[in-house]
């Protein structure tokens, strides 16, 4: 894939905590010293999901080789949920950044598939409920699913969504407030 084919969606990028100037500079030095980008840029429909900083470095150094790894999602909300979940794996998140990402993931997953989460039947792909009572599976709340995966509580996840909406509102009122 050509570098010029890739796009940055501001809605996706704003879910990713920014690097400090020192962190960005160190990343650039490492990429230039390695002579390649070691980690692939993760993309969905040529839009970058992970690798925004690497992409900016590549724009400054177009001679450096890179790879992409495509992901498949049914809509932008699934992509946003993936971005948030992927960022939650970072070790250097502040508690506020983690809370924001959990809130945005919850918001995106609700928008993608509604407020409940169930797995489709393995054979049919259909979402079904057995009336026999033996295999009755009630839909799991999206907040409960995320809470279990992030070692938090349902109320934490639901409060994190309100926190994230507040952060977004503050950012809309005073641009740049989120990054410091």
Language model features with spans:
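Short, charged/polar connector segments at secondary-structure boundaries
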Residues: 1-71, 78-92
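Alpha-helical structural motif
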Residues: 23, 27, 76-80, 98, ...
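Alpha-helical interaction elements
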Residues: 91-180
């Amino acid at each position: 894939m050509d570098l010029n084919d890739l796009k940055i969606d501001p809605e996706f990028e704003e879910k990713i905590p920014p690097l400090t100037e020192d962190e960005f500079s160190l990343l650039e030095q490492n990429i230039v010293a390695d002579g390649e980008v070691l980690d692939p840029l993760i993309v969905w429909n040529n839009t970058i999901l992970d690798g925004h900083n690497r992409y900016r470095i590549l724009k400054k150094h177009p001679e450096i080789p890179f790879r992409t790894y495509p992901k498949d999602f049914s809509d932008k909300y699934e992509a946003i949920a993936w971005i948030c979940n992927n960022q939650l794996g970072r070790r250097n998140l502040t508690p506020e950044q983690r809370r924001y990402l959990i809130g945005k993931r919850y918001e995106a997953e609700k928008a993608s598939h509604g407020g409940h989460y169930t797995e489709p039947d393995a054979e049919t792909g259909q979402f079904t409920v057995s009336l026999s009572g033996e295999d009755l599976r009630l839909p799991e709340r999206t907040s409960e699913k995320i809470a279990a995966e992030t070692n938090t509580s349902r109320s934490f996840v639901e409060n994190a969504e309100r926190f994230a909406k507040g952060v977004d509102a503050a950012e809309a009122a005073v641009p740049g407030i989120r990054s410091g």
